[in-house]
UniProtKB/Swiss-Prot annotation:
It comes from Salmonella paratyphi B (strain ATCC BAA-1250 / SPB7). It is an enzyme of class 2 (transferase). This is Cobalt-precorrin-5B C(1)-methyltransferase. Gene3D superfamilies: CbiD-like. One of its GO terms (molecular function) is cobalt-precorrin-5B C1-methyltransferase activity. Belongs to the CbiD family. It holds the Pfam family CbiD. It catalyses: Co-precorrin-5B + S-adenosyl-L-methionine = Co-precorrin-6A + S-adenosyl-L-homocysteine. PANTHER family: COBALT-PRECORRIN-5B C(1)-METHYLTRANSFERASE. Its EC number is 2.1.1.195.
Length: 379
């Protein structure tokens, strides 16, 4: 990525969005400038780094401080126009020079600790991912030269509080934020980074020994699993709108059973072969309902009423009034059929189940008895 492409906005739905930089870039810049300040013994207020993607960032330094052979500096995280829990917080680095010739990197206050397998870092280590570890160590080495050593501590006083707004606790990263970023640049509303974070949770579940997974669109699905199915929510992973992607990831990781649980407003799209359920990709909810109601022999009056509905909930009221509630079992079976069609070239496809529920947490339908599915999930 060139500097020009970094400055150029990302266009989403006709709106220009500004790029930002990652916590990894902040930590790298903070460590570099702290190392330089120790060597030069004077405060520095601006520092430049080259990100892994080749972009040169020139960043303002905050809270610079020197005390003997130790210096501290901070960089303020700027996520651009991305929705980011770490936006605006300070990422600090403390660099202490020594004669060991080695660079050691640790995480201090506000940096999470890895407590589960699956994130690619040793248990008990600081949640500083591999790419930022490399860039931090390289930047410090460049600053101090080949002979000196340094102890580098990355810390973030707001980290523990900010981490409450992230997926870290679900990933087994406790006590703070993660220092992340493979490119060093934050692309606003990047689907790829969002998908990757969801997939990472799948990897952690699999690494913990789970072989069966429940995919839900969001928090409502997890609550239903806990309250109505009596199943440990450790098996639940959010798929958001990325149904096809998360199913393929679950297959790649070797899960033997995938259970899709959600409200018809989301899952009905899968019955039509739509595996990205965001409304800007496709809708077809009413068309799908009308088609399958017709297959079940629904009267034209009901088909017309459903066709004119704007929401799935409104359509469900008509379906109930006409006594066609059995469509939900039919749709659940159709969802499973569509998933198996998508996985038709998979050598050992997993068992697929689907459960539909209402907003008041009542079971609407499933491809087979829910008790049977729940029993298997508890094995």
């Amino acid at each position: 990525m060139s500097e020009l492409s970094f400055d150029a906005p990302v266009w989403r739905h006709g709106k220009a969005l500004r790029k930002g930089y990652t916590t990894g870039s902040c930590a790298t810049a903070a460590a570099k400038v702290a190392a330089l300040m120790v060597l030069r013994q004077h405060l520095i207020h601006q520092v430049s780094i080259v990100t892994p993607s080749g972009v040169t960032l020139c960043l303002n330094v905050e809270s610079p401080h020197i005390e003997g052979q130790q210096a501290i500096a901070a960089i303020r995280k700027d996520g651009g126009d991305d929705v980011d829990a770490t936006h605006g917080m300070l990422i600090f680095a403390r660099v202490t020079l020594n004669d060991s010739g080695e660079i050691t990197l640790t995480g201090g206050e506000g940096i999470g600790t890895v407590t589960r397998k699956g994130v690619g870092l040793p248990l008990g280590s600081a949640a500083i991912n591999r790419t930022p570890r490399h860039t931090i160590e390289s930047a410090v080495r460049e600053a101090i030269g080949p002979a000196r050593g340094a102890d580098v501590e990355i810390f973030a006083p707001e980290g523990e509080a900010r981490a409450q707004k992230t997926y870290n606790s679900r990933l087994g990263i406790l006590g703070g934020i993660s220092i992340i970023g493979t490119t060093g640049i934050v692309t606003p509303m990047s689907e790829e980074s969002w998908k990757r974070s969801l997939s990472l949770e799948l990897e952690i579940k699999r690494a913990s020994g789970l072989t069966r997974v429940i995919l839900v669109p969001g928090n409502h699905g997890e609550r239903f699993v806990r309250e109505q199915m009596g199943v440990d929510t450790q098996a639940v992973v959010t798929m958001s709108n990325f149904v096809g992607y998360m199913i393929e990831e679950a297959v790649r990781l070797g899960f033997c059973q995938i259970v899709l649980v959600g409200h018809p407003g989301k899952l009905i799209k899968i019955a039509a072969g739509i595996f990205h359920t965001h409304s800007h990709i496709a809708d077809a909810r009413m068309e799908t309902l009308v088609a399958h109601l017709a297959l079940l022999g629904a009267p034209l009056e009901l088909l017309t009423l459903v066709s004119d509905c704007d929401t799935t909930e409104a359509a469900m009221e008509h379906i109930e009034a006409y006594g066609f509630g059995h469509i939900y079992n039919h749709l659940a079976r159709r969802i499973c059929l569509r998933v198996m069609q998508m996985l038709r070239f998979t050598k050992t496809p997993p068992v697929c189940d689907a459960i539909l529920f209402s907003f008041d947490n009542h079971i609407l339908g499933s491809n087979r008895p829910v008790d049977e599915i729940a029993k298997e999930l508890q094995c």
